[in-house]
């Protein structure tokens, strides 16, 4: 409770080492881990009270390919998430947990710490190895480009207007569409 600081609800099922940020949408909050074990839980916020572990408030759960470092990304009803040391991207319907695409092994990348971002109908994934992948995610997952940058990336990209900001270990990059007809 924001006014009193009292705990409203709690839910077990994740390890104590949760790095990825939770994602909220469609009346649910989704939290995940994969350090000690792999787990992702979707919790219905309405009516959540007390210890909801194993209750009907937990709408769905996954036990494989869950993220450790990169946070999941919600685009409409699609929840995208990365298995950070394997370069595997998965997608589920946030409402049901049912597969909505993938899993896809991403080309050229293995280690991903940065969270994926989406803008202009495109999905962006940046790897520790300096590879920035751009996908069309409207129908499946289609690779549009793979950009090799002379840097390593742990920070998540930021979309600002029609620009994409990437913070590498050595440089800050600003990528912008080449023409007004295309967008970030």
Predicted features by range, described:
Residues 1-184:
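Noncatalytic, solvent-exposed loop/strand surfaces
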């Amino acid at each position: 409770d924001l006014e009193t600081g009292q705990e409203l609800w709690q839910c077990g099922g994740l390890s104590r080492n949760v790095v990825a940020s939770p994602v909220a949408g469609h009346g649910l909050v989704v939290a995940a881990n994969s350090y000690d074990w792999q787990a992702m839980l979707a919790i219905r916020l309405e009516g959540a009270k007390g210890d909801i572990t194993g209750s009907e408030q937990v709408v769905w759960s996954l036990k494989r390919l869950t993220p450790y470092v990169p946070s999941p990304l919600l685009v409409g009803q699609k929840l995208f998430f990365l298995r950070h040391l394997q370069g595997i991207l998965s997608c589920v319907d946030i409402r049901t947990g049912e597969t909505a695409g993938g899993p896809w092994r991403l080309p050229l990348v293995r280690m991903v710490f940065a969270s994926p971002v989406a803008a202009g109908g495109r999905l962006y994934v940046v790897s520790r190895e300096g590879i920035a992948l751009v996908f069309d995610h409207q129908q499946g997952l289609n690779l549009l480009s793979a950009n090799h940058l002379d840097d390593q990336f742990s920070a998540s990209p930021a979309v600002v207007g029609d620009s994409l900001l990437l913070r590498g270990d050595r440089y800050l990059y600003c990528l912008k569409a080449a023409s007004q007809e295309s967008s970030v």
